A protein has these predicted regions:
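Charged DNA-binding/catalytic regions of mobile-element recombinases
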Residues: 1-247
């Protein structure tokens, strides 16, 4: 049995983290505690979490039907497959916000989140090119059959850069499960938590959330590492044979 003062200190830190991360459950909070050097059994953290009344309230799904996600083949390296999609939101005055989300299916990194009032196929191609200049071009991009993604501009961009476009079947969002999962987190932890009054404000807030998502947020599919941490380890592992060859 842990002394009361230890439980009190752990609970206090747990409450503080939960207030900073309003949409995190106990598993992610436990990962943050571990990262800080506080090593506590996850069952103990769960008990203190419940006793402190910190359980995250589940938001109702907009669509009443539960859909089972299809199992997608997991890529084996960064830049093997990127997934792209749109998430819609609005400013306080009702004007539409369109967010282009780009995710690396292997590292789970949010490659970019582009925010504007309107985004055409040519705009999508330009933003992918901007991301690729920094990260390298992906081998393939998975997307739905929206008009921006089936446009001549994106098709020409993909052909020119040796990128395969993988179009999912119409009406089958589960075939794009990796980015559907990301979009759910983006809406729950960012869009639903903020009230945007201008496009500039939305861009600043969303860029900050994306950075935090990549660099700090523990990801369950990556053994609670952040995407950036996981990606850095992958790059280091991939670089080892190349270094040895030149010795």
């Amino acid at each position: 049995v842990q002394p009361d003062h230890e439980n009190e200190a752990l609970t206090a830190r747990l409450v503080a983290l939960a207030h900073e991360r309003r949409r995190f459950g106990y598993r992610r909070l436990h990962a943050l505690l571990e990262r800080e050097g506080t090593h506590a059994n996850h069952k103990r953290v769960h008990r203190l979490y419940r006793e402190a009344g910190l359980a995250v309230r589940r938001r109702r799904r907009r669509h009443g039907v539960m859909v089972e996600r299809e199992q997608l083949a997991l890529p084996s390296a960064p830049n093997e497959v990127w997934s792209i999609d749109f998430v819609m939101d609005a400013l306080s005055n009702g004007r539409r916000l369109k967010c282009l989300t780009i995710v690396d299916d292997f590292t789970k990194e949010a490659v970019d989140i582009v925010v504007d009032h309107g985004i055409s196929g040519l705009y999508v191609a330009r933003m992918l090119d901007r991301a690729a200049r920094f990260r390298g071009y992906p081998k393939a991009i998975r997307t739905d059959q929206g008009p921006e993604f089936t446009s001549r501009a994106l098709d020409q961009w993909a052909y020119a850069n040796g990128v395969t476009l993988k179009l999912i079947q119409a009406g089958k969002p589960t075939q794009n499960a990796y980015i559907e999962s990301f979009n759910g987190k983006f809406r729950d932890e960012c869009l639903n938590e903020h009230w945007f009054t201008t496009l500039a404000q939305a861009r600043v807030v969303i860029a900050a959330w994306r950075q935090d998502y990549n660099e700090a947020r523990p990801h369950s599919a990556l053994n609670y590492q952040s995407p950036a941490e996981f990606a850095a380890k992958q790059r280091a592992t991939a670089a080892v044979p190349a270094v040895q060859e030149h010795v």
